[in-house]
From Swiss-Prot:
Lineage of the organism: Bacteria, Pseudomonadati, Pseudomonadota, Alphaproteobacteria, Rhodobacterales
EC class: transferase
Reaction catalysed by this enzyme: heme b + (2E,6E)-farnesyl diphosphate + H2O = Fe(II)-heme o + diphosphate
Pfam families tied to this protein: UbiA
Subunit-structure text: Interacts with CtaA.
Listed name of the protein: Protoheme IX farnesyltransferase
Stretches that traverse the bilayer: 22-42, 46-66, 98-118, 121-141, 150-170, 177-197, 223-243, 246-266, 284-304
Length: 313
């Protein structure tokens, strides 16, 4: 598909609705940002006034949405090619690229300034860095440059609990980085599982995902290796200041299931995968979402129960 045909097909066909502009913010991704940032905020040792806490999470969410809009602006050409993304507002002809850029920039500035005013300058600055990392380092550079794109770029999605912690404390410590590392190590097996059954999409869009550059067999090995590392870290985290019996129980069960799934994926025959439409890979991808949500849910439970002597060790 030529650039001219891509631009022509992205010409606005009708007036955009509020829902179309909201879709630019990647609400599903934003929900993960909101939840992990909230856990980081609540796990902090310094209590935050509910109004300030609400404002902090709101502005972090807006910053995450701004990143999504800028990502869609830059990736409009490949979104048009991929089946998974061609229904997004820009390739669907509902929102102009210029509008997405303007919205993303405006929300970026708003979120950073308001978070700094509502909490502290350190939190605002870290949010600004996160937006920059996701948009410039990952979207504009790494995504189309290397099969390690989501390994390095995954840091952007792992920063929200750190921002939440800083918003509450105004300082840095080891605890938020444990939450960062949990998300950072989770990102590769999560996205590589998606890439296993969406390989053709990435290939057509000329995105060098590991499945495209190294093949599915190599990707399966990488998923297994990263899952083993993730499981070891997740279980070790249970014995740190953010862990406790609730987290340990959750981690044991979830990592047993996740490791089992990774081994199943590693052993899979490609012909069988094609015949059952990557059933196991799709299930593993869905499990990965539950995996991260429940780990952070357990960290949140430990933090909420700790003042009553029921959380932590």
């Amino acid at each position: 598909m030529t650039d001219a045909s891509i631009n022509a097909s992205m010409t606005r066909e009708e007036e955009a609705s509020l829902g179309d502009y909201f879709a630019l913010l990647k609400p599903r991704v934003m929900s993960l940002v909101v939840f992990t940032a909230f856990v980081g905020l609540m796990a902090a040792p310094i209590g935050v006034h509910p109004v300030i806490g609400f404002c902090a999470i709101l502005f972090i969410a807006i910053g995450g949405g701004a990143s999504g809009a800028l990502n869609m602006w830059w990736d409009a050409d490949i979104d048009q090619v991929m089946k998974r993304t061609k229904g997004r507002p820009i390739p669907a002809g509902k929102v102009d690229k210029g509008e997405a850029l303007s919205l993303g920039l405006a929300l970026s500035g708003l979120s950073v300034i308001m978070l700094a005013l509502a909490t502290n300058v350190f939190a605002g600055a870290f949010l600004a860095f996160t937006i920059f990392f996701y948009v410039v380092i990952y979207t504009m550079w790494l995504k189309r440059a290397t099969p390690q794109n989501i390994v390095i770029g995954g840091a952007a999605g792992a920063f929200p609990p750190v921002i939440g912690w800083i918003a509450a404390t105004g300082s840095m410590s080891v605890e938020p980085w444990l939450m960062f590392a949990l998300t950072f190590l989770w990102t590769p097996p999560h996205f590589w599982a998606l890439a296993l059954f969406m390989r053709n999409d990435y290939d057509m869009a000329d995105v060098p995902m590991l499945t495209v550059t190294h093949g599915r067999r190599s990707t399966r090995k990488h998923i297994l290796v990263y899952t083993v590392i993730l499981a070891a870290f997740a279980l070790t985290t249970a014995f740190t200041s953010v862990g406790g019996p609730i987290y340990l129980t959750t981690a044991v069960v979830l990592n047993a299931l996740f490791l089992k799934g990774a081994v199943q994926i590693w052993r899979r025959d490609e012909e069988i995968c094609e015949s059952d439409n990557f059933k196991i890979e799709r299930s593993f991808f869905k499990l990965s979402l539950l995996y991260l949500f429940l780990h952070f849910g357990a960290i949140l439970a430990e933090a909420l129960l700790k003042p009553y002597g029921l959380g932590g060790w």
